[in-house]
Curated annotation (Swiss-Prot):
Transmembrane residue ranges: none
Sites where the protein binds dUMP: 74, 199-200, 239-242, 250, 280-282
Family membership noted in the UniProt record: Belongs to the thymidylate synthase family.
Name the UniProt record assigns to this protein: Thymidylate synthase
A GO molecular-function descriptor: thymidylate synthase activity
InterPro entries: Thymidate_synth/dCMP_Mease, Thymidate_synth/dCMP_Mease_dom, Thymidate_synth/dCMP_Mease_sf, Thymidylate_synthase, Thymidylate_synthase_AS
The UniProt record lists the keyword Methyltransferase: yes
NCBIfam families: PRK01827.1-3, thym_sym
Pathways involved: Pyrimidine metabolism; dTTP biosynthesis
Gene: 70
Active site: 219
Length: 337
């Protein structure tokens, strides 16, 4: 709903065109779209050239902008959304860190290591200089979730807790959960090593009994691993994908997780398959993503693991080196909270 008295269609069109939008007529729907129609932007591949895998992401953006359903959402900002999308990224010769904008690589590494520790304290991650969970751990946000009794930074039984202590009774972010619950991470490492053809090599963060205790229920909620020909591949199911900010981060995070698991189990990284449920673009991100769609992908970087480690707990941020990452400049987008 617009917070003003309805105007004639003619006047409304003039107002919105002045703000850089145009009206696109769809069957039964009058939708706003950017003045530069993203549907017209194409990234051509000529000859026998192998298409750049980042084009999958750009096509997803374009498809959502062109055909997305206009939906209300938890944040009140509003989104354009499509249901059910998939992309596949090879991990064999490169690492799928998007290049049409700079992705916060240090944040990807620090957040994943924080998950792997089982931590639920956003202040711990913030002390590393990665503040992506600060707003969700704020007093205001926790109170809005009915969690005003929690101290600032206590996110509840979110990703890391479910990965390392699934089923344990959550007390707070400061409690010691050693030996409590089911350690899914250790379980999948054991399966990959000892029963690699098992079809249950799954790690899941979606625990319905704990959802009301979480500052934010998991968006990327289930990953399954698959071993074939000495390679480890991963498929992620993500119920909710913020295409502007979250999805580029998630692609890198689960690709990194696959590299790490392959390293400790003596395998090679194979492929990352990313399956999205509600794939959406926040309306505040439309303009930045229009800019991103005008950019041509550059070669993906390579990822090197610099020392031999035998367990997931041994990894540190200094163990990873990104080689030849030359992205386009950063594109600023505000996080929807």
């Amino acid at each position: 709903m617009f917070p003003f008295v309805p105007l004639s269609l003619y006047v409304a069109k003039k107002l919105f065109r002045a703000r850089g939008f145009r009206f696109c007529q769809k069957p039964g729907v009058l939708a706003l779209a950017p003045e530069v129609d993203p549907c017209s932007i194409q990234h051509e591949v000529t000859g026998a050239e192998t298409p750049h895998e980042e084009l999958q992401y750009l096509r997803q953006l374009r498809e959502i902008l062109c055909r997305g359903s206009d939906r209300l959402d938890r944040t009140g900002i509003g989104t354009l959304s499509l249901f059910g999308m998939q992309a596949r990224y090879s991990l064999r010769d490169h690492f799928p860190l998007l290049t049409t904008k700079r992705v916060f690589w240090r944040g990807v590494v620090q957040e994943l290591l924080w998950f792997l520790k089982g931590s639920t304290d956003s202040r711990e991650l913030s002390r590393t200089g990665v503040k992506i969970w600060d707003k969700n751990g704020s007093r205001e946000f926790l109170a809005g979730r009915g969690l005003a009794h929690r101290r600032e930074g206590d996110l509840g039984p979110v990703y890391g807790f479910q990965w390392r202590h699934f089923g344990a009774a959550y007390v707070d972010a400061d409690a010691d959960y050693t030996g409590q619950g089911f350690d899914q991470l250790s379980y999948i490492v054991d399966l990959i090593k000892n029963n690699p053809h098992d079809r249950r090599i799954i790690m899941c963060a979606w625990n319905p009994a704990d959802l009301s205790l979480m500052a934010l229920p998991p968006c990327h909620l289930l990953c399954q691993f698959y071993v074939a020909d000495g390679e480890l591949s991963c498929q992620l199911y993500q119920r909710s994908g913020d295409m502007g900010l979250g999805v580029p981060f998630n692609i890198a995070s689960y690709s990194l997780l696959t590299y790490m698991l392959a390293h400790v189990t003596g395998l090679r990284p194979g492929e990352f398959i990313h399956t999205l449920g509600d794939a959406h673009i926040y309306k505040t991100h439309i303009e930045p993503l229009r800019l991103q769609l005008t950019r041509t992908p550059r070669p993906f970087p390579r990822l090197e693991i610099l020392r031999s480690v035998s367990s997931m707990e041994e990894f540190t941020p200094d163990d990873f080196r990104l080689v030849d990452y030359c992205p386009h400049p950063t594109i600023r987008m505000e996080m929807a909270v």
